[in-house]
Amino acid sequence: MEYQEKIQLQLEESQSKLQKQDKNNEICNAEVDKLVRFVNASSCIPFANSPGIYKIQVSGVDFFDVLCDSQLAGPGWVVIQQRVGGKKRFNRDWATYREGFGSMDSDFFLGLEKIFRLSNSRRHELYVHLVELNGTIYYARYDDFKISDENNGYALSLGGFMGNVSDAMRISENLKFITFDRGDDKRCADHYKSGWWYKSCYNCNLNAVYGTNFNWYLILF
């Protein structure tokens, strides 16, 4: 009887160890899957539950840093432009707008080439989020945002609109991006000290000189 009890106890201990090992294996496999998703990330979706700065890669460009946001419009968005303090000048030349500039903890622009690659990797939605200093929030959503390649001037395409402001960016649809050193025949970029998709010098221009009444963000999903 004592022998049987001893064997039974050993059996139960072995089963307990196996169960713990299985649990550890499950945790390990989950961590491996998570790391694989992170390593192969081409958007902010894998980082939906932990927003911050991560490296992603899309076809045509090397790995690059993106700011992933999950607060403004839901989880998994890529911030492509941020104006939160007016510390960075947006009156930049074509090459700088192509590559991107600024700091992701302050004002920045991701870069036209990266935005082109991202927006053409699959269908993307653009969300424009504006916050007045009194806390009032305004937004605009475009359900099929993309820009063309550099040879075609990074021309703008928006898709359908929804928001609690007017469809102010529509005037820029199908237009090429303009900077003070490229395409600025009407001197709009020079006058407003910023690159943008100008039709005339009166535009919805989210790269214009920073005003103290709003902070704003452009994000892609």
Where are these regions (language model features)?
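Calcium-regulated, polybasic anionic-phospholipid
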Residues: F64-E99
